[in-house]
Each structure stands twice: as structure tokens, then as C-alpha cells.
Amino acid sequence: MNKLSQLKGHRILFIGIGFYDYDQSIIAELKKLNKEVSYFSTHTNIWNLLIFKRLHLNKISEKILKKNIDRQINRSSINNDIVFVIKGENFDDSHLIKLRSLNPNAIFILYLWDDLHRLKNLNTLNYFDKIWSFD
């Protein structure tokens, strides 16, 4: 969190993955730093996705996920100072282009829990100003 506290700007759009209570803990810490935080998760409706994946209907699963992320982006706050994304594995170019257009002056930060070699969407890294990792 120390790196985020050093960044200028108080409005943060935090895009998490809804993993246990990590996202809520991160939001609480950001608020302690006097940041105004808006949030959404890229992993809502996970049960529907799991069912389709188990049935080997990956195209349907991907379409549902993409629509869900589109809907979340359209509902998200705009003109943020920082867009802070954890993992970002479900984003495609269109999602990040839309986020950039809604937050034209924001610093885009990607935080990775995994090594870059494990990313399936390496092409989206170019949309981020900073990439941080646990390493």
C-alpha cells in the first residue's frame, strides 16, 4: 500500500477479483490513506461461469464474462485519478480502451499475483502505466 499512498490523487477505481475478503481489506487500507474508492470485481456470477466451463462451453462462459465486465465498466465511476487493477486476467483490449476513455487523466496500475509468464493476455499490459508484482 505504501506505493499507492505516494501517488497523487484521491479518487481510485479499484478493480479486484473478489477473492475471499482481500478486496475489502484493500479498500479499507486505501480509505485509511484518505483515498475515495470505487470498486468492482471482474469475477461476479462465478457459478454460472463454472457450470459452462464444466460443460466445456467455454465460448458461452467467455461471452458471459465479457458482458459482465462491460456492464461493470459502464456502471463504474469516471474521472478517477488512479485505476488500480489486480490481475486483470479477464480484461481484453476493448475493456481497457473503454476504461481509458472514462478516466482519461488516470494513472493505470496493474498489480500481479503471478509471474508474467502465466498471463494469458499479455497484449493488455500496454494499457497500464505501472505494473507491480508481489516479487
Residue ranges and their predicted role:
Residues 3-18:
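Nucleotide-activated donor-dependent transferases that construct or modify glycoconjugates
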Residues 13-15, 22-27, 32-33, 38-135:
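Extended catalytic core of nucleotide-activated donor transferases of GT-like folds
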